[in-house]
Amino acid sequence: MRHTRRNIFYHELIGLRIKIIEYPDKSLVGLTGLVIDETQKTLLIETNSGRRVRVLKANGVFQFMLPNKEKVIIRGVQILGRPEDRLKNIVR
């Protein structure tokens, strides 16, 4: 199944380009990079300079770039939970 705007919640986010649109720590707003790890509550982002930043999903609004170059904005609370649990839900 391809990544689309409608089914991104069920896909693995690791490997997608990301930009932080809103976040309580204003120094992180605008940060761009690649999602290199995901847990139930966090995303680990590697910036273009190689810096790694872990952010809480629930606190932010993120823009993901899908493999087809489409940009999707998602509130972090929509992607809370372990990635494997989100993937299991699509099978049910």
Curated annotation (Swiss-Prot):
Keywords for the protein's UniProt record, in alphabetical order: Cytoplasm, Endonuclease, Hydrolase, Nuclease, tRNA processing
Primary subcellular site in the record, as a coarse category: cytoplasm
One cellular component term from this protein's GO annotations in UniProt: ribonuclease P complex
Domain of life: Archaea
Annotated catalysed reactions: Endonucleolytic cleavage of RNA, removing 5'-extranucleotides from tRNA precursor
Annotated compartments: Cytoplasm
Function of the protein: Part of ribonuclease P, a protein complex that generates mature tRNA molecules by cleaving their 5'-ends.
Oligomeric and partner information: Consists of a catalytic RNA component and at least 4-5 protein subunits.
Family per record: Belongs to the eukaryotic/archaeal RNase P protein component 1 family.
Protein name from the UniProt record: Ribonuclease P protein component 1
